[in-house]
Design a protein with these regions (language model features):
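Single conserved hydrophobic/aromatic residue that forms the stacking wall/gate
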Residues: 1-9
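Mobile gating loops/cap/lid regions near enzyme active sites that modulate substrate access
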Residues: 14, 18-144
Length: 144
């Protein structure tokens, strides 16, 4: 898919940060986790569009402009909302569970990023772990 210049630099920044974190770490000691947010929403996976998904603020003002149509689940509380797209709501639920796991356990519940596997979590219609999802940025910028 075609990427805008901002997306190219964002990917390069993430790849650089991840590579620098694991540079001198044995793979089994890695405490680095990387994700790639690809939920299409209304405007694609724009910068910060993942925040309502991570924090469950789907009913917040303007959140639906990023993540897609939402339905209020409690008329007394317009911020209580779920995505109308079932796959999107499942993705949001899984993202919130990963964040909670990270806070409680010190890891998000998916394999850590290391210089051997470079695993990252892909948040899209079918969330999954993927090997080296930032390979394009890593190799383009000569990171390894």
């Amino acid at each position: 898919r075609s990427r805008g210049l901002g997306d190219v630099y964002k990917r390069q920044t993430i790849a650089t940060a991840a590579e620098n974190r694991v540079l001198d770490q044995p793979a089994e000691e890695s405490h680095t986790w990387v994700y790639d947010y690809r939920w299409p929403g209304r405007r694609g996976a724009a910068h910060c569009a993942d925040i309502p998904m991570w924090f469950g603020t789907l009913g917040a003002d303007t959140a639906d402009r990023q993540v897609g149509p939402v339905t209020t689940t409690n008329p007394a509380d317009p911020t209580a909302a779920v995505l109308e797209d079932a796959a999107g709501q499942t993705t949001a639920d899984l993202m919130q569970s990963a964040l909670t796991h990270f806070i409680k356990e010190g890891n998000p519940g998916w394999p850590s990023y290391n210089d051997l596997t470079r695993i990252c979590m892909v948040w899209d219609e079918k969330p999954h772990a993927e090997m080296d999802c930032y390979k394009d940025a890593r190799t383009t910028w000569g990171l390894s």
